[in-house]
């Protein structure tokens, strides 16, 4: 699972470089976390933008990460588009990432992962 998350991150960064011509102008906070990126989307990808995140900060960061993926890969047929299956498969990896990289330990990120992912998918899947 960890390998899938790492490969996903590498592919997202690679895609971001390819999309530099499509990057929209944004106002970015100067105190963004080192584990945060915009990847050319209107959504922030990665950790909460605070050194001491609350549970809601962590859930919001996870939600915006899924929305960034939907923004980067709007075609549901694209292999990188988040899916219902990936929501359930990546819970442990997400918990490990948000706990170890973002300071979200103790907030039940694995349990929240499926709900937050499905909530984001409900917004980004075209009808």
Swiss-Prot record:
What is the annotated localization of this protein?
A: Secreted
Residues of the signal sequence? 1-16
Keywords from the named record: Pheromone, Secreted, Signal
**Any Pfam family hit:** Euplotes_phero
InterPro entries tied to this protein = Mating_pheromone_EUPOC
Pro-segment residues? 17-42
Top-level division of the source organism's lineage: Eukaryota
The molecular function terms in GO held by this entry are: pheromone activity
The record's Gene Ontology cellular component field reads:
extracellular region
- Say if the entry is tagged with keyword Nucleotide-binding: no
Functional note? Mating ciliate pheromones (or gamones) are diffusible extracellular communication signals that distinguish different intraspecific classes of cells commonly referred to as 'mating types'. They prepare the latter for conjugation by changing their cell surface properties.
Question: What name has this protein been given in UniProt?
Answer: Mating pheromone 4
Q: Which organism is it from?
A: Euplotoides octocarinatus (Freshwater ciliate)
């Amino acid at each position: 699972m960890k390998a899938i998350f790492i490969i996903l991150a590498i592919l997202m960064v690679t895609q971001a470089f390819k999309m530099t011509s499509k990057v929209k102008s944004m106002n970015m906070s100067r105190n963004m976390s080192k584990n945060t990126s915009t990847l050319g989307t209107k959504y922030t990808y990665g950790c909460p933008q605070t050194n001491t995140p609350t549970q809601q900060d962590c859930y919001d960061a996870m939600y915006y990460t899924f929305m960034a993926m939907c923004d980067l890969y709007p075609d549901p047929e694209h292999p990188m588009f988040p899916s219902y299956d990936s929501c359930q498969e990546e819970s442990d990896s997400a918990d490990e990432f948000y706990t170890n990289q973002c300071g979200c330990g103790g907030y039940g990120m694995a349990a929240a992962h499926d709900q937050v992912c499905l909530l984001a998918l409900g917004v980004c899947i075209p009808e």
